[in-house]
């Protein structure tokens, strides 16, 4: 699973998921992409599940780029803990995704294979997605 090697702060604020993605919303590396249509937090486990689906489906044929990285720690308190006594310990990592953000890019396979692979990977995502092709 993906996680940062080190961060400036252990326990970040939750923040708001307002607005659309202004960066990372265009196809840069590959020819096909999976784009988020809704705001959400995507966990490192979900990113890894999508990556496994895509790599297994395209075999050795294609190249894959993951365009998001889980750099925000989500804290959890133990079950049955009373209120107070501070914030919980970091439990898992999430990538903050705004609408329009590219999640995965792919190259080196036909459009039908890429579309099918991205469709299967989209089932692993907690958000509505859209398949994009690079326009010249």
UniProtKB/Swiss-Prot annotation:
Location within or outside the cell: Plastid, Chloroplast
One GO CC term on file: chloroplast
SUPFAM superfamilies registered for this protein in UniProt: Ribosomal protein L16p/L10e (SSF54686)
Single GO MF annotation: rRNA binding
GO biological process: mitochondrial translation
Keywords annotated in UniProt: Chloroplast, Plastid, Ribonucleoprotein, Ribosomal protein
Key word Secreted present: no
Claim: Glycosyltransferase is one of the keywords in the record: no
InterPro entries per the UniProt record, alphabetical: Ribosomal_uL16, Ribosomal_uL16_bact-type, Ribosomal_uL16_CS, Ribosomal_uL16_dom, Ribosomal_uL16_sf
CDD domains in alphabetical order: Ribosomal_L16_L10e
Quaternary assembly: Part of the 50S ribosomal subunit.
Annotated family: Belongs to the universal ribosomal protein uL16 family.
Name listed for the protein in its UniProt record: Large ribosomal subunit protein uL16c
Species per Swiss-Prot/TrEMBL record: Chlamydomonas reinhardtii
């Amino acid at each position: 699973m993906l996680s940062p090697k080190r961060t400036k702060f252990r326990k970040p604020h939750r923040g708001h998921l307002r607005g659309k993605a202004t960066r990372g919303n265009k196809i840069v590396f590959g020819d096909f992409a999976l784009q988020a249509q809704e705001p959400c937090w995507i966990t490192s486990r979900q990113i890894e599940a999508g990556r496994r689906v895509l790599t297994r489906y395209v075999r050795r044929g294609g190249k894959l780029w993951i365009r998001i990285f889980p750099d925000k720690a989500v804290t959890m308190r133990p079950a049955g803990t009373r209120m107070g006594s501070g914030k919980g310990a970091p439990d898992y990592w999430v990538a903050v995704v705004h609408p329009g953000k590219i999640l995965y890019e792919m190259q080196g396979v036909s459009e039908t294979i890429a579309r099918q692979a991205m469709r299967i990977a989209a089932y692993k995502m907690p958000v509505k997605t859209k398949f994009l092709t690079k326009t010249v």
